[in-house]
A protein has these predicted regions:
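Conserved donor-binding/catalytic core segment of Leloir-type glycosyltransferases
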Residues: 4, 206-222, 228-231
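Nucleotide-activated donor-binding/catalytic signature segment of Leloir-type glycosyltransferases, i.e.
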Residues: 251-275
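Membrane-proximal helix-turn-helix segments that form the acceptor-binding/catalytic region
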Residues: 23, 82-89, 104, 108-112, ...
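Acidic donor-binding loop of glycosyltransferase active sites
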Residues: 156, 265, 279-296, 309
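Conserved acidic donor-binding segment of nucleotide-sugar-dependent glycosyltransferases
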Residues: 325-336, 343-349
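Carbohydrate-associated surface elements
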Residues: 164, 184
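A charged, aromatic-enriched C-terminal amphipathic alpha-helix characteristic of glycosyltransferases
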Residues: 347, 351-379
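N-terminal subdomain of nucleotide-sugar transferases
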Residues: 1-45, 226-234, 316, 390
Length: 390
């Protein structure tokens, strides 16, 4: 099939949804399909057989876009829609595959051309408004909830990335249109170079202390206040290494740590190349996911589980819909409980849990399984549309 994919993100940048889009395209390519990707004017080109990238025009004064909703994103989406319209009238497509708020553009494409529409629902658009502290306006939140409902009702097929989104979508549209595809793929090879891992640990300057590591964005919903409060409950034999965050976020956090007397126990590395993350994970003694808001599974969880390093995560639906106590230490989102979870993971129990997690990933999170699920979602899109494709 010839597929038009709408991605209102900077493709490719090493963060949540672009990672997911990348692996969707990889799977579609392996299945023999051709993809025309319409995306933002930022990001790295990726070479995948059958992929063509069409970037929207860059609005004056906008040179980047942060994670989550923003005023800049609204402007970029308007320019993206113009690019989508251009492709709609210049290309022949068998399917339109939309991501996130691009779903409403997919609905327009579907209505005007009778092309089957596959909606890739990575999150609740309405919930994002609160998670990213973008707005508390009931009117704005209601607007995005309406967009979400229109997209769900009109799509011939819907991909959801976690059980919470599945339940939410099933309350709006037919459950037989839904396909649950967790974002478990990661094509970065595991780090087996022990010398490199040792040098990384030495570069942290933490000496013989137990290294607790978080790798990911520093957005409000990720739970940094909980993690910092938990570090205060642990003795000085523990150090925290934070990988990720913008320069501004890192500077703000550095000031907070200095004010609380923790600057000497926390290493702030900022963003690191995506290809290097497996080595950083292996350099840790304990990995943490202190997320406190939202219901989506953090994409980073899958690489954490596959790292061979014990994981501590908050005992909230964002984690528990996928993670069991058999493969991670689950702790209440309270400083004392989370600190106790870190201490437990640093001991003998942590090694056993990490081994079970690694085995679980090897058995369940395979490229073959992922490709089967993508093929199933495509089949539903074709079967559920009045226009049949070939």
């Amino acid at each position: 099939m010839n597929i038009l994919m709408i991605a209102p993100e900077p493709f490719f940048e090493p963060r949540g949804t672009p990672f997911s889009e990348y692996f969707r395209i990889r799977a579609l390519s392996a299945l023999g399909h051709r993809v025309d990707l319409v995306t933002y004017p930022f990001g790295e080109d990726r070479q995948i057989p059958g992929l063509r990238i069409f970037r929207s025009w860059r609005p004056p004064g906008i040179r980047a876009v942060k994670t989550g909703p923003s005023g800049a994103k609204l402007v970029l989406d308007a320019f993206l829609f113009l690019r989508v319209l251009g492709r709609m009238f210049s290309g022949q497509y068998d399917l339109v595959h939309s991501h996130e708020e691009g779903s409403i553009m997919g609905v327009v494409f579907q209505k005007l051309t009778r092309t089957p529409h596959l909606y890739d629902m990575h999150s609740s658009l309405a919930q994002q408004m609160g998670n990213f502290q973008f707005t508390r306006s009931r009117l704005v939140i209601r607007f995005f909830r309406i967009i979400e409902r229109i997209s769900l009702k009109n799509a011939a097929s819907v991909i959801v990335i976690c059980r919470a989104l599945y339940d939410q979508a099933a309350a709006v549209t037919a459950a037989d249109k839904l396909t649950l595809i967790e974002n478990f793929l990661d094509d970065r090879p595991a780090c087996t170079d022990e010398g490199r891992v040792r040098r990384l640990r030495e570069s942290f300057g933490t000496g013989a202390r137990t290294i607790v590591m978080y790798a990911g964005t520093l957005e409000p919903y990720q739970g940094m206040p909980l993690l910092i409060d938990s570090m205060e409950r642990l003795d000085a034999s523990y150090s925290l290494v934070l990988v990720g965050g913008t320069a501004e976020q890192v500077a703000d956090l550095r000031r907070v740590l200095a004010a609380r007397g923790l600057a000497g126990r926390v290493v702030l590395l900022g963003r690191q190349p995506a290809a290097d993350i497996p080595a950083y994970l292996r350099a840790a003694d304990v990995l943490v996911s202190p997320r406190t808001l939202g219901t989506n599974i953090p994409l980073k969880i899958y690489s954490f589980l596959a790292s061979g390093v014990p994981l501590v995560a908050t005992d909230l639906p964002t984690h528990t819909q996928t993670i069991s106590p058999d493969i991670a230490v689950l702790a209440r989102p309270e400083p004392e409980a989370f600190a106790a979870g870190i201490a437990r993971a640093a001991g003998a129990a942590g090694k056993e849990i990490a081994a079970r997690a690694l085995d679980f990933c090897r058995r369940n999170y395979t490229p073959e399984r992922y490709q089967e699920l993508v093929a199933a979602a495509l089949a539903k899109a074709v079967a559920g549309s009045p226009r049949r494709t070939g």
